[in-house]
């Protein structure tokens, strides 16, 4: 029926708005609370051998944190499910992992001529699911983390979680 369709569309639009709000909250938090870190939502250029990239999508990061020679690219994810089931086993969303890996490797290549360390993080809003991804992987010389941010707590605890990410990554 129309009412069911409207509800589904509204739920979808609300989820899109929440996702964007989640991304902006994290970005603005780091801008305000860590002025020594450059926090932006930078585009990452494709590193093409032939220079032909007309049909390639723009690589737009949600959050890119830079401090000295370290860069952390954060892809903020606000989903109702932080994992997907594949053959009866909980797995990370493969598209998300491919995306952050692509961002990191292209940024790494862009900075090849200067000292740098590029890492990536998928930062999911924590859900009530039993399995909560909090892992770290080393892929082709880069650290890729998957973390959750618990939003169902006092703001001081949310701030502490975000602070830990910056402090651990940038040795602050």
Annotate each PLM feature.
Residues 15-172:
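Catalytic core segments in nucleotide and nucleic-acid processing enzymes
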Residues 1-19:
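Interdomain/boundary linker segments immediately adjacent to catalytic/signaling cores
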């Amino acid at each position: 029926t129309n009412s069911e369709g409207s509800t589904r569309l509204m739920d979808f639009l609300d989820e899109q708005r929440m996702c964007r709000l989640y991304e902006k909250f994290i970005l603005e938090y780091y801008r305000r609370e860590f002025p020594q870190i450059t926090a932006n939502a930078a585009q990452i250029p494709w590193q093409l051998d032939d220079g032909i990239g007309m049909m390639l999508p723009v690589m737009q990061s949600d959050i890119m944190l830079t401090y000295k020679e370290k860069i952390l690219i954060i892809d903020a994810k606000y989903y109702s499910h932080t994992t997907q089931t594949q053959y009866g086993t909980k797995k990370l969303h493969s598209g998300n992992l491919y995306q952050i890996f692509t961002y990191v490797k292209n940024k790494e290549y862009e900075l090849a001529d200067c000292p740098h360390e590029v890492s990536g993080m998928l930062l999911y809003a924590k859900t009530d699911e039993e399995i909560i991804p909090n892992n770290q992987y080393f892929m082709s010389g880069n650290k890729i983390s998957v973390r959750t941010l618990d939003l169902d707590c006092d703001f001081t605890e949310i701030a502490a979680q975000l602070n830990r990410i910056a402090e651990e990554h940038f040795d602050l």
